[in-house]
Regions:
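Aromatic-lined carbohydrate-binding surfaces of glycoside hydrolases
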Residues: 157, 168-175, 180-381, 389-398
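Mature N-terminal, pre-catalytic/accessory segment of carbohydrate-active enzymes
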Residues: 17-254, 353
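Catalytic-core region of carbohydrate-active enzymes that cleave or remodel glycosidic bonds
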Residues: 406-463
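Aromatic- and acid-rich polysaccharide-binding/catalytic face
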Residues: 385-411
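Bacterial N-terminal signal peptides
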Residues: 7-16
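Positively charged n-region of N-terminal signal peptides that target proteins for export
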Residues: 1-4
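Short, glycine/acidic-rich beta->alpha junctions
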Residues: 72, 227-228, 277-281, 366-367, ...
Length: 463
């Protein structure tokens, strides 16, 4: 599968504030030596580092002051750590307005999260599981158990019109009536970062709406489902996401994810042998994502699934039928060509055709070429996107793709090649999946690895 879904990223696991019932955290399988708590006589609060994953079972140390730097329009994060030798029944925290003379960055522009712990592991059968802080939780209060550490996360959104200078404020944490405070300083320079919708960086983190429905136990595509997805997808838009992930067949990756991707387009074979297609779910999903601010590209997976199995509803028998066929076979053509023609007409009617890509990933080149030939037969103006575990130059098909994403290991592409593609309006990116071990965006990955991936793409000249 091409890319780690967005749910693995701490930034995007900040769940809807509407959900105030949280699953209990698991016990720490590796708590470490508890003697480290013997010298801790009372609760303490300090500024930590956003680059450190603090153990829940060990006391944390940090600084009493913090100075952050930001452009106008930038988002910056901070992490504080609360360690306590005794049970704290009720912990809450607030951040004041940040003031620079008469200029103010209001507290409403600072999102606050308790950081919850999740179980992770390095590799199946290669190491034991361990606990890491990863889930940014919007809950307003929390019980903190004795001899534990609880990180607190701040997401500061600097206005684009903020006056340059040093802003100062205070973080206040209330623990059973006792207040702990830390000063916070933010240095804002004169440079301005554009709105995320204007960023050129082509970020494509796959979305899985089915995971959200399962997590919150709500019906697929219900109002409750969209209500839970909205704050998550707006966070994704704020990160600069450009692409909407759509599954146009059932289980395009052979159900390899915990929450399988279902088809957003229903395909129905009529009694007379003709075809009808229901785009209701597809249309609602795409429009919803556009309303959240993600509207540059629509990637539709896939015409070359990992299991080569396609399904449709057969009106003659009132049952769902499955067909196993590959792009070179006649059955594939009979099934896919009518759909592609109808899909193109639908996309054009919606005004979405020129931003839509038929997307394929990591399949044998002969199968990709056969599918691509059929796509062009259906409509020569279709665009194709591919996640390719091939080196550039292995095939001429790559040169035809509107958007190619190359496996991280093969991401040393001649800059002049990417410049030539860019001049034609084409995109060239690289991707991570279950590889490499690092840098990546697993729950166990160091936080700096995600930042490095962006800098690495820029340095190599990718889009």
């Amino acid at each position: 599968m091409k890319k780690i879904s967005l749910w693995a990223l701490a930034l995007l696991t900040a769940l809807s504030a509407q959900a105030q019932t949280f699953e209990p955290e698991l016990a720490d399988p590796k708590p470490g030596a508890q003697e480290t708590w013997n010298s801790v006589k009372k609760a303490s609060l300090a500024w930590g580092s956003t680059d450190i994953r603090y153990s829940r079972s060990q006391p944390a140390t940090g600084q009493k002051t913090l100075l952050l730097d930001a452009w106008r329009g930038e988002r910056v994060s901070a992490q504080a750590v609360l360690s306590t030798p005794v049970d704290l029944a009720r912990v809450t925290f607030e951040v004041s307005d940040l003031r620079n003379g008469k200029a103010i960055i209001p507290a409403s522009r600072i999102n606050k999260y308790f950081v919850r712990y999740v179980m992770t592991d390095w590799h199946e059968n290669k190491s034991d599981s361990f606990l890491l802080p990863d889930h940014l939780s919007p809950e307003t209060e929390m019980k903190v158990e004795a001899r534990t550490t609880r990180p607190l996360w701040l997401d500061i959104r600097v206005p684009q019109d903020a006056k340059p200078g040093t802003y100062k404020g205070t973080l206040t944490v209330n623990c059973d009536g006792q207040a702990f405070t830390l000063p916070l300083s933010l240095q804002v320079c004169s440079r301005v970062l554009p709105e995320p919708s204007e960023w050129a960086f082509h970020l494509d983190l796959w979305q899985n709406p089915y995971a959200v429905a399962r997590y919150f136990n709500v019906p697929l595509w219900s109002k409750a489902h969209f209500d839970h997805m909205r704050p998550i997808m707006k966070l994704l838009a704020d990160a600069g996401e450009k692409v909407i992930t759509c599954s146009i067949i059932q289980h395009p990756w052979n159900s390899q994810t915990y929450d399988p991707f279902e088809s957003m387009i229903a395909k129905m074979k009529q009694i007379d042998g003709s075809w009808k297609y229901d785009y209701t779910v597809f249309d609602r999903w795409v429009q919803f994502m556009m309303d959240c601010g993600i509207d540059k590209q629509i990637d539709c997976y896939t015409l070359v699934p990992w299991h080569y199995v396609f399904d449709y509803y057969d009106c003659a028998t009132n049952s769902t039928k499955t067909v196993k066929c590959e792009p070179k076979q006649a059955e594939y053509r009979e099934l896919i060509l009518p759909f592609l023609k109808d899909f193109a007409a639908h996309l054009k009617a919606k005004g979405w055709f020129t931003r839509t890509c038929i997307a394929m990933d990591e399949r044998p080149m002969d199968q990709l070429q056969a599918a691509w030939d059929l796509v062009k037969e259906a409509d020569s103006q279709y665009r194709i996107e591919g996640a390719m575990n091939y080196k550039v130059g292995d095939t001429g098909l790559i040169d035809e793709m509107h958007d190619i994403s190359i496996l991280y290991y093969d991401a040393h592409v001649p800059r002049e090649y990417m410049d030539a593609r860019r001049a034609k309006g084409q995109k060239t990116t690289f991707y991570t999946c279950c590889a490499p071990d690092r840098p990546n965006t697993f729950t166990f990955s160091d936080p700096a690895e995600s930042a490095f991936l962006g800098w690495h793409a820029y340095t190599l000249g990718f889009d």
